[in-house]
Amino acid sequence: MMQPKRTKFRKQFKGRIHGNSKGGTDLNFGAFGLKAVEPERVTARQIEAARRAITRHMKRAGRVWIRIFPDLPVTSKPTEVRMGKGKGSVDYWACRVAPGRVMFELDGVPEDVAREALRLGAAKLPIKTRFIQRIAE
């Protein structure tokens, strides 16, 4: 699973996702993509599950680019522990995804295969998505 090699600080604030994505809204690498429609926090496990579903349907043909990275440490306290006594330890890593953000890109496969692969990948994500395609020039 993806996580940063090192960070400046071990723990971060929860934060909010305001407005639309400032960058990463266009296809830069592949011909097809999966774009977020609503704001949500996506975990490293969910990104990995989506990646596996996509590559499995493509039967290792073509290429997949993951355009999001889980750089947000999410903490949690153990069960049945009273409130207080500091912030909990890092439980998992997540990524804040704003609406309009391209999360996955594909290339080297036909459109019907790409559409189905991204549909299977989107089922693993806790977020509404849209299939996008590069306009032929």
Swiss-Prot record:
<keyword id="KW-0689">Ribosomal protein</keyword>
<dbReference type="InterPro" id="IPR016180">
    <property type="entry name" value="Ribosomal_uL16_dom"/>
</dbReference>
<dbReference type="GO" id="GO:0003735">
    <property type="term" value="F:structural constituent of ribosome"/>
</dbReference>
<comment type="similarity">
    <text>Belongs to the universal ribosomal protein uL16 family.</text>
</comment>
<keyword id="KW-0694">RNA-binding</keyword>
<dbReference type="InterPro" id="IPR020798">
    <property type="entry name" value="Ribosomal_uL16_CS"/>
</dbReference>
<comment type="function">
    <text>Binds 23S rRNA and is also seen to make contacts with the A and possibly P site tRNAs.</text>
</comment>
<dbReference type="Pfam" id="PF00252">
    <property type="entry name" value="Ribosomal_L16"/>
</dbReference>
<keyword id="KW-0687">Ribonucleoprotein</keyword>
<dbReference type="GO" id="GO:0022625">
    <property type="term" value="C:cytosolic large ribosomal subunit"/>
</dbReference>
<keyword id="KW-0699">rRNA-binding</keyword>
<dbReference type="GO" id="GO:0019843">
    <property type="term" value="F:rRNA binding"/>
</dbReference>
<dbReference type="InterPro" id="IPR036920">
    <property type="entry name" value="Ribosomal_uL16_sf"/>
</dbReference>
<dbReference type="InterPro" id="IPR047873">
    <property type="entry name" value="Ribosomal_uL16"/>
</dbReference>
<dbReference type="InterPro" id="IPR000114">
    <property type="entry name" value="Ribosomal_uL16_bact-type"/>
</dbReference>
<keyword id="KW-0820">tRNA-binding</keyword>
<protein>
    <recommendedName>
        <fullName>Large ribosomal subunit protein uL16</fullName>
    </recommendedName>
</protein>
<dbReference type="GO" id="GO:0006412">
    <property type="term" value="P:translation"/>
</dbReference>
<dbReference type="GO" id="GO:0000049">
    <property type="term" value="F:tRNA binding"/>
</dbReference>
<comment type="subunit">
    <text>Part of the 50S ribosomal subunit.</text>
</comment>
